[in-house]
């Protein structure tokens, strides 16, 4: 995760430049974010209004409120752990989780992230997020499969001596 490291397309303050092999899944406007580092750091960042973008590689938040402590936030999808949907009795629904730091990202230690969807859209976000996590898990499980030696190639018997017993009878019956 990193603070103020998002690269924008030229002439735009909200259109992010996608990484290689990255595609945009969805964007959600009117999202508030709070990032609270766990002890011993206790640093925190908050913003009451911004744009949240979900790609196949990362979660990107762009602050739209000028009073925010930061301009943008991004985290690789694989660095978000223990995520969950929270539905309080009073207040807007929010999504929370633990974010692991990246080297030189501006955030010193793992942090608790809270995304509050003030203008709706949380269920669309959760659906897209769950599909993305499922893809990550499928790729991870495929990479862990033990690859055995390949089967030898099949060669059709060239003579009747190479054929199994009663082969001719079985072929002629059909």
From Swiss-Prot:
InterPro entries: WBP2-like. It comes from the Eukaryota. One of its GO terms (cellular component) is cytosol. It is found in: Cytoplasm; Nucleus. SUPFAM superfamilies: PH domain-like. GO terms for biological process: positive regulation of DNA-templated transcription; positive regulation of transcription by RNA polymerase II. Induction: By stress. One of its GO terms (molecular function) is chromatin DNA binding. CDD domains: PH-GRAM_WBP2. Keywords: Cytoplasm, Nucleus. Residues 147-174 are annotated as: Disordered. Residues 165-174 have a biased composition (Basic and acidic residues). Belongs to the UPF0664 family. This is UPF0664 stress-induced protein C29B12.11c. It comes from Schizosaccharomyces pombe (strain 972 / ATCC 24843).
